[in-house]
């Protein structure tokens, strides 16, 4: 059975390979340090049969954004700088790609961000897509490209709340 849990030293970070050296290195060398320092939180997708093997991971953090770069129609709605959530990284192991693991983790990340938004103010979620394929993946969840920055994407918190309620994910854990 698949589950998502916080990254710990017990997880086998060295064996993880998503095909992107920068993401592999982050998980292996930096993620636990950033958790310890309170910079970000990394969550891993594991199977209960082999709970130390990482099938995928995502990292969440907070950020401060310059709102003049927001997509048309959003830039003028906020002060010059505003707080937001950042999906800093999302990766799936090569042997698990194209099996819905990314969508599973994205849904979990959005759920966690919604919980945060109930307690602190954020205008939405930001993500830096690595390439056009990644951008296409995020756009299916409603992300919009920033003005003049086609690989930097934004999902307004109101859009996330509305989509979540319409899909009735509230009953999932």
List each model region and its residues.
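Conserved acetyl-CoA-binding loop-helix of GNAT-fold acetyltransferases
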Residues: 98-112
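A short, internal acetyl-CoA/4′-phosphopantetheine-binding micro-motif in the GNAT/acyltransferase core
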Residues: 88-98
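Short glycine/proline-centered loop/turn elements that form peptide/ligand docking sites
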Residues: 106, 131-134, 150-157
């Amino acid at each position: 059975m698949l589950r998502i849990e916080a990254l710990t030293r017990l997880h086998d970070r060295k064996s993880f390979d998503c095909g992107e050296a920068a993401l592999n290195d982050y998980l292996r060398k930096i993620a636990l340090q950033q958790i310890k320092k309170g910079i970000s939180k990394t969550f891993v997708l594991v199977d209960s049969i082999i709970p130390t093997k990482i099938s995928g991971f995502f990292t969440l953090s907070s950020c401060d954004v310059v709102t003049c770069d927001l997509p048309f129609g959003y830039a003028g709605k906020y002060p010059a700088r505003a707080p937001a959530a950042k999906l800093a990284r999302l990766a799936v192991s090569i042997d698990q790609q194209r099996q819905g693991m990314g969508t599973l983790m994205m849904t979990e990340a959005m759920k966690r961000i919604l919980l945060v938004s109930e307690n602190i103010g954020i205008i939405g979620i930001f993500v830096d897509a690595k390439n056009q394929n990644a951008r296409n993946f995020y756009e299916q969840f409603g992300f919009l490209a920033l003005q003049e920055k086609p690989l930097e994407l934004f999902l307004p918190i109101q859009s996330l709340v509305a989509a979540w309620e319409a899909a009735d994910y509230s009953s999932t854990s």
